Swiss-Prot record:
A GO CC term attached to the entry: cytoplasm
Organism name: Acidothermus cellulolyticus (strain ATCC 43068 / DSM 8971 / 11B)
Taxonomy of the source species: Bacteria, Bacillati, Actinomycetota, Actinomycetes, Acidothermales
Family listed: Belongs to the elongation factor P family.
Pathway of action: Protein biosynthesis; polypeptide chain elongation
Name listed for the protein in its UniProt record: Elongation factor P
Length: 187
């Protein structure tokens, strides 16, 4: 149990039996009337974002979320199998829970899995990963009608936009949050 004055970004709240992550918060002290806290909350399971206002000092339930480092092993049907690197327990996590992180997951890659009472909530990847381009069209010198980028397929099957000078077989850095090309990998 905490108060709204203790809110921080990334905190997970239990509101009416549902889990919400605090995306943004702002303490507001108007000239007239009581202080309040304006928040932007993201539903952990659905990803829905809502604005919610709390009176300052009101008690809220903080959910205990255990973030554990896990290794991605393989995909089995509609679920991804992760292994806890400390206990060696295996978790079958549905594709819906993994979300967009699936586009950048390679076998044996490490990720942080958030657990609430033993149930996986979401998967966090590092901010950037290095992946190999499996296919891209050759870039033609002087072809600028597309703004200097072209589509490329990664070894995970995901498609991203890369500069014209990138060729098939090259390793590139990709931002896992936006799916954008960051540069060539330092290998």
């Amino acid at each position: 149990m905490a108060t709204t004055n203790d809110l921080k970004n990334g905190m997970t709240l239990d509101l009416d039996g549902e889990l919400w992550n605090v995306v943004e918060f702002q303490h507001v002290k108007p000239g007239k009337g009581p202080a309040f806290v304006r928040t932007k909350l993201k539903h952990v399971l659905t990803g829905k974002v809502v604005d919610k206002t709390f009176n300052a000092g009101v008690k809220v339930d903080v959910a205990t979320v255990d973030k554990r480092t896990m290794q991605y092993l393989y995909r089995e049907g509609d679920s991804f199998v992760f292994m806890d690197t400390e206990t060696y327990d295996q978790y079958h996590i549905p594709a819906q829970t993994v979300g967009d992180a699936a586009n950048f997951l390679l076998e044996n890659a490490e990720a942080v899995v958030a657990l609430h009472e033993g149930t996986p909530l979401y998967v966090e990847l590092p901010a950037a990963v290095e992946l190999t381009i499996t296919y891209t069209e050759p870039g033609v010198q002087g072809d600028r009608s597309t703004g200097g980028t072209k589509p490329a397929t990664l070894e995970t099957g995901a498609q991203i936009q890369v500069p014209l000078f990138i060729t098939t077989g090259e390793k590139v850095k990709v931002d896992t949050r936006t799916g954008e090309y960051l540069g060539r990998a330092n290998s």
